[in-house]
Amino acid sequence: MQGKNLTRRTVLTMASGAAVAGILSPARAQQVPWSTGAEPAKTKAPPNATDCHHHIYSSRFPVDPKAVLRPGDALVADYRLLQKRIGTTRNVVVQPSTYGINNTGLIEALTEFGSAARGVAVVQPTVSDEELKALHAAGVRGIRFNILTPGGATSVEMVEPLAKRIAGMGWHLQFHVGPDFILANKDLLNNVPCPVVFDHMAHIPASSGTRHPAFTAVVDLLQKGKGWVKLSGAYMESKVGSPTYSDISGIAQAYVEAAPEQLVWGSDWPHPTEKSDNKPDDAVLFDLLAQWVPDQAIRNRILVDNPARLYDFS
């Protein structure tokens, strides 16, 4: 009888210990599609933390014939797993070049996400006022010019006419461009009647860093309150790579020092520029922000307050 009691007691103790361990130890997040690793981020996200740059892909929507990037499905349900892993609760869905000016998938994703999401669309000057109003009602607050990716549906000639169309709506212009574009179009960027937002730290090369004249041009826009930068895509220009991306840190930290009130953060999930067997670890990318911005109050500003202002979150 005593042997049986000991066995039962041992089993109960083991079960209890396992339950306590499950409560006290960090939960292992479910594997997120298009992301390396499964551990949660070490940095605690504040309430209403916002991922200001990600995409949604679905094979249900027609691909633009000129599109170069054609990832597999990366759905709303998949992205929610990423939110659970890193702790963000608000998000900005960016129309990818894959679908050109067909924003149907973007609108569907915004509807599924609900009021905690905003969007950035891709349009051309022929877009009607009714279409712009419908996009606004769906949660869109900006339009994107992807000049860097071949086969994009937009061009520099479209910037001025579209800027005039959206300025009164409280929208912004989002630019996926390189340093050469920034330097060649400084007057345009300064004079358009709405804010300008640069994807992925404006693609400043790690080799030149803050010495690059395009960095100076971007900082000038930030300090005027005209420009914004997304602290995202560290892997795009880094030669050092994961987990430190140390050759990019100086650029990110210099942006923070220059104008923390004009910065937002983004994951760039599902990382369409990266091969499927070389996706970054999204928890590592989120934790980078704490290294770049050790001051929690400033970090919260970048994750919560700045996005609320730029994307009209109430």
Q: Which positions does each model-derived feature cover?
A:
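Mid-to-C-terminal alpha-helical segments outside catalytic/metal-binding sites
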Residues: 2-23, 31-48, 76-90, 260-262, ...
